[in-house]
Swiss-Prot record:
Native organism: Streptococcus mutans serotype c (strain ATCC 700610 / UA159)
Family note: Belongs to the phosphoglycerate mutase family. BPG-dependent PGAM subfamily.
Keywords per UniProt: Gluconeogenesis, Glycolysis, Isomerase
Isomerase recorded as keyword: yes
SUPFAM superfamilies per UniProt: Phosphoglycerate mutase-like
Entry protein name: 2,3-bisphosphoglycerate-dependent phosphoglycerate mutase
Entry keyword annotation includes Isomerase: yes
Gene assigned in the entry: gpmA
Transmembrane segments: none
């Protein structure tokens, strides 16, 4: 029986300020740092031993991964970073206050942008200060691959190859895996793992804490799903 632990990053400074974050590289808040530490402690209490870990290329997820591994006494575990585990790209909403966006565009429209499976938010301008096109961490990517906006459908389409190439093979090899990622990249993978419908995934929320655990048999059928400490 192998285990996959999903840890959404702890609260970020922009979570705290109620801003759309997406691919903007925002740090953890003080509360978020503590959540990551507490995640590690829960993992240690549950005696889950990892063989490898995966995270995005965004600071808040990287720090959460490192802290969770450190406080579960597993900081030595190999960690691979990939842009494919990044948060969903919120396009032109990035950096905007969620309440102010609702006032400007209407509650219903903002809700559709946030929760629908296949509706895109407004695209980010190429010269936007938060544009990934000029960010060095994406220098090895073809410019056409870098998104200017994503919905959950597109997020799953770019995360799924990483699942199939890296994460699923590790689980099939009997390895326990830690994934430190983001609310929507985790939601996308949960949709695939549980084969949820487009409508059902709309009601799924991934909290900053505690970590979500899946247990699988040798054929990657889910045998258990639970949040640590609950």
């Amino acid at each position: 029986m192998v285990k996959l632990v999903f840890a959404r990053h702890g609260e970020s400074e922009w979570n705290k300020a109620n801003l759309f974050t997406g691919w903007a590289d925002v740090d953890l808040s003080e509360e978020g740092t503590q959540q990551a530490i507490d995640a590690g402690k829960l993992i240690k209490e549950a005696d889950i031993k990892f063989d490898l870990a995966f995270t995005s290329v965004l600071t808040r997820a990287i720090k959460t991964t490192n802290l969770a591994l450190e406080y579960s006494d597993q900081l030595w575990v190999p960690v691979e970073k990939s842009w494919r585990l990044n948060e969903r790209h919120y396009g032109g909403l990035t950096g905007k206050n969620k309440a102010e966006a609702a006032e400007k565009f209407g509650d219903e429209q903002v809700h559709i942008w946030r929760r629908s499976y296949d509706v895109l938010p407004p695209a980010m301008a190429k010269d936007d200060p938060y544009s990934a096109h000029t960010d060095r961490r994406y220098a090895n990517l073809d410019d056409t691959v870098i998104p200017d906006a994503e919905n959950l459908k597109v997020t799953l389409e770019r995360a799924l190859p990483y699942w199939e190439d890296k994460i699923a093979p590790a689980l099939k090899d009997g390895k326990n895996v830690f994934v430190g990622a983001h609310g929507n990249s985790i939601r996308a993978l949960v949709k695939h793992i549980k084969q949820l419908s487009d409508d059902d995934i709309m009601g799924v929320e991934i909290p900053n804490f505690p970590p979500l655990v899946f247990e699988f048999d040798e054929n990657l059928n889910v045998t258990a799903e639970y949040y640590l400490g609950k």
